[in-house]
Amino acid sequence: MLDKNKQIWFIGIKGTGMASLALVLHDLGYNVAGSDIEKYTFTQVPLEKAGIEVKDFDPANIKSNDEQVIVKGNAFKQDNPEVAACLDKNVEWQSYPDTVEEIVQMHTSIGVSGTHGKTSTTSLLAHVLGEVAPTSYLIGDGRGKGVADSRFFVYEADEYRRHFLAYHPDYQIMTNIDFDHPDYFKDQDDYTSAFQTAADQTKKALFVWGDDKRLQSLKTDIPKYTYGFKDTDDFQAVNIEKTTTGSKFNVLAHGKDLGRFEIHLFGDHSILNTTAVIAVAYTEKVPMEDIKEGLLTFKGAKRRFAEKDFGDVSVIDDYAHHPTEMRATIQAARQKFPDKELVVVFQPHTFSRTKKYQKDFEEILRDVDKAYVTPIYASAREASGDISSEDLVNNIPGSEVIDLDNIADLTKHKNAVVVFMGAGDIPKYEDAYEKLL
């Protein structure tokens, strides 16, 4: 249980979720510190900026439950020296999800779950609500902020290993249920059942994408509102105008026109995410004029269609690693850069996902102007497999395998948009390429 009279000690404080949570608690006035590996990570920058102490793993860091509340990262087991110290000293710990749930219960809370679009939607919702009321947020890309006396707490709810079932929010946005994490979930039914339980644990209302049949099949005792492009949706985006600077559209709430909204984001998925955000705000009686202003100042989420320009070459960094996400990112790139050559550098993420979606990946990459595939990114829980990047390239005409030693091949593309896609360490490929521009 969180306690402002004790130190909150994070075992694994540099993890993206853990770093975000540490920042939230620090902002809310808790005494936060923690430990992790020595290797530099991007998440330690905001921790250092906030003055949060980060030490190496050491059994001496573990005191007693009278002095500390221990928050243990999900990845750390008994072979970690601090976890071992907790066991030796009979010091109890709590998990990341259980700690987040304590914050969920302190505020009007909105969770964002779904296979795709969680980070983008959470970021947008936190930004828009934060423009009109004190809002704390926790985002899966390493960002978190606590605001004293917050009205809202907006957080990303990750379904992996059913972590999001620790939460009981007031509202929940569910973007889609598209089978993922085949290393953990047995099949689609097993995956969908986790979302059914999450829906059961939501208190006031559920907001779901109207085109997703699995979301439609969820049973709930609370209102379940749909959002999308169809006349049957409770919150419908209409009169859509797409340009190279973004999109404009009206939103109807149960047939009532809430006005015209503008976003500097691209692709149908961005319009859908925005409509979900508008639906939540409308339900909480947030003035629509305030929402319109907030949308205009939103710059986008980290590693979600993040753009840099180098003369006639635009470089996009995107977290897409599932077929649905890849299609959305490619659609967004075509909307913003209709006259440029579309070059995709794709890093497959985990062997099990690559095997499961091999045909989808190949189909998607056959549809771009030029495709490059890096070696498969192996996760800590899955170091090898019976598929390789060469297997994909062999089925994609004109594509090539690319690695750091031949990254210079990308420089032959002029008047191009080069999209780096992946959830692993693909930024190292992007960095190497940008140094050559």
From Swiss-Prot:
Cell wall formation. GO terms for molecular function: ATP binding; UDP-N-acetylmuramate-L-alanine ligase activity. The keyword Cell division applies. It is found in: Cytoplasm. Belongs to the MurCDEF family. GO terms for biological process: cell division; cell wall organization; peptidoglycan biosynthetic process; regulation of cell shape. It comes from Lactobacillus gasseri (strain ATCC 33323 / DSM 20243 / BCRC 14619 / CIP 102991 / JCM 1131 / KCTC 3163 / NCIMB 11718 / NCTC 13722 / AM63). HAMAP family: MurC. Signal peptide: none annotated. Its EC number is 6.3.2.8. The gene is murC. It catalyses: UDP-N-acetyl-alpha-D-muramate + L-alanine + ATP = UDP-N-acetyl-alpha-D-muramoyl-L-alanine + ADP + phosphate + H(+). Its main location: cytoplasm. This is UDP-N-acetylmuramate--L-alanine ligase. ATP binds at residues 114-120. Keywords: ATP-binding, Cell cycle, Cell division, Cell shape, Cell wall biogenesis/degradation, Cytoplasm, Ligase, Nucleotide-binding, Peptidoglycan synthesis. It comes from the Bacteria. NCBIfam families: murC. GO terms for cellular component: cytoplasm.
